[in-house]
Amino acid sequence: MGLNFFMSRKIYYIKLLTGLYKKFIKALIVKKNESNNAYLLVETANFYNLVFSLQRSSLTQFKVLNDVCIVDYPEKIDRFELSYNLSSIKYNFRIFIKTYTSAYVPSISTLFNSANWIERECWDMFGVFFTNHPDLRRILTDYGFEGFPLRKDFPLTGYIEIRYDDEKANIVYEPLELSQEYRLFNFTSPWEKIK
């Protein structure tokens, strides 16, 4: 069995996926490279049903959630792009499911145990709310932390300073008085050629 057989099997599998789940899928993108990964673009309303079907169907069996990645695009209406990386061990196939949201996404922690901490981290760093999550609370920052530090509109200096005070022998929270404007990245890079 050569590489061509393996690639044709992957392409067949991608076509099978699109046929089975066309009512859920908004768009399908296949990267033409050695991996032929499939990227499914899904509306947030159809997201949970698609993942549930992909996991439970005997034709797909995506039983492993590898990772969830978030990108913040503040200029868009649905500013957060979530990319879920799922694997089917039985069929030796990996799929990426992308959805866009401005506020919330259905939690898949009931389907994948590994999603619990990943979704908590996404909430803590970006502020994306996962509906029906059993324990959505901060996991990396302090419980009194204000804001979401990986959003592009979060100030580099933060909002408060946390330090240990030797005189009080306690941790002290003080508001920062540094003024910082919104970060705009509209400048020429020194690595780009000037025309």
UniProtKB/Swiss-Prot annotation:
GO terms for cellular component: mitochondrial inner membrane. Signal peptide: none annotated. Its main location: mitochondrion. Its EC number is 7.1.1.2. InterPro entries: NADH_DH_suC (IPR010218), NADH_quin_OxRdtase_su_C/D-like (IPR037232), NADH_UbQ_OxRdtase_30kDa_su (IPR001268), NADH_UbQ_OxRdtase_CS (IPR020396). It catalyses: a ubiquinone + NADH + 5 H(+)(in) = a ubiquinol + NAD(+) + 4 H(+)(out). It is found in: Mitochondrion inner membrane. It holds the Pfam family Complex1_30kDa. PANTHER family: NADH DEHYDROGENASE [UBIQUINONE] IRON-SULFUR PROTEIN 3, MITOCHONDRIAL, NADH DEHYDROGENASE UBIQUINONE IRON-SULFUR PROTEIN 3. Complex I is composed of about 30 different subunits. NCBIfam families: NuoC_fam. Belongs to the complex I 30 kDa subunit family. HAMAP family: NDH1_NuoC (MF_01357). This is NADH-ubiquinone oxidoreductase subunit 9. The lineage of its organism: Eukaryota, Amoebozoa, Discosea, Longamoebia, Centramoebida.
